[in-house]
Amino acid sequence: MIITNEIARRSKAGGLFFFVILPVALTIYFTAIYIGAAHGQAWALHNQTYVHMNSWFHYAKLYAATFGCIGFMILKYHWGKLGKAYWFKCFPFVIVAINIFIAVGSDFESAIRGMNALQTTGSQWWLSSEGVWLYGGWWNVLNGIAGIINVFCMTGWWAIYSSKNEDDMLWPDMIWLFILAYDVWNFEYTYSNLPTHSWYCGVALLLAPTFAAAIWNKGVWIQNRANTLAIWCMFAQVIPEFQDSGRFAVLPVLYKNGVMNPAVHPGAADPTMMGVITILSLVINVVVFAIIWKRATSKGINPYTHEVFVGTKDYEEAMARAQK
């Protein structure tokens, strides 16, 4: 993920390949699969993408992340009227908020389905359209609320800059506080709603952009996140069995018996970690939100139309890279 992110961010050709050419080709591929499935073609009905990655969430996430990457390229390269328009600088906030709300909706869906399953089967296990048993409950509701708060932990919505060499789109006011709040919230989302993928799209996929932003790519966490997320979603949509079966498959402790078989209703569950992490997610997001408003109030500013973290180490290091 780190390597592909570097290729995509350092050249226009790399960015256009990963976020325009490849998505167009994959869209044609996905369309062909669903047309084939609609006509009862065996190759389509048994295709990995059709069997394991058919939920609304995965497609929404893939295309929302990809549109984000394209928008970030427009901003950092100042392409056309959009790339030079002041109003378009809030695009990163809008697309990130959309991505968060997609996950929030999925969290609430899992809670509702878990409660419905409890009424009908006496268990909170419910089977997703992709053949994964999920365990919906109050942790989904609390994490959904944490996600909504996380949206409003983004500050300085119009304070978007291009780096001096135009490799990067900078959001200097998005410092480590937001990154921490987002990472914990998003990990809890993947742990609860994509449990069989949580090692990859949870731990690894969150560490990749955070590592890059912390070490060499200051102020660019959101671009790193969008790039790695979009590229991973494309890979996982085409080759989902990489993480679903075989030596690379990982199951969380939720599956108390250590088995996830779509044909067999699970018995025992251990949702303890989901509860612990979701409480941590909610607490961290509330604390970050409070810090933001405390700083904004002391400065007498609106934290969404103005930058809140001017003067902090993260902010100043990012601004040192910005075009003046």
Segments predicted by a language model, with ranges:
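Membrane-interfacial helical/loop segments at transmembrane boundaries in membrane proteins
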Residues: 39-54, 109-135, 246-269
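Alpha-helical transmembrane segments and their cytosolic membrane-interface
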Residues: 1-40, 136-183, 274-285
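C-terminal transmembrane-bundle signature of multipass membrane proteins
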Residues: 1-2, 201-323
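Hydrophobic alpha-helical transmembrane segments and adjacent interfacial helices
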Residues: 21-41, 70-76, 93-110, 175-192, ...
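Hydrophobic cores of alpha-helical transmembrane segments in multi-pass inner/ER membrane proteins
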Residues: 1-2, 60-76, 142-158, 204-210, ...
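An N-terminal, globular interaction/scaffold subdomain
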Residues: 1-91, 95
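Short, structured coil/loop segments at alpha-helix boundaries
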Residues: 11-14, 81-85, 132-135, 139-142, ...
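Generic multipass alpha-helical transmembrane bundles of integral membrane proteins
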Residues: 86-219
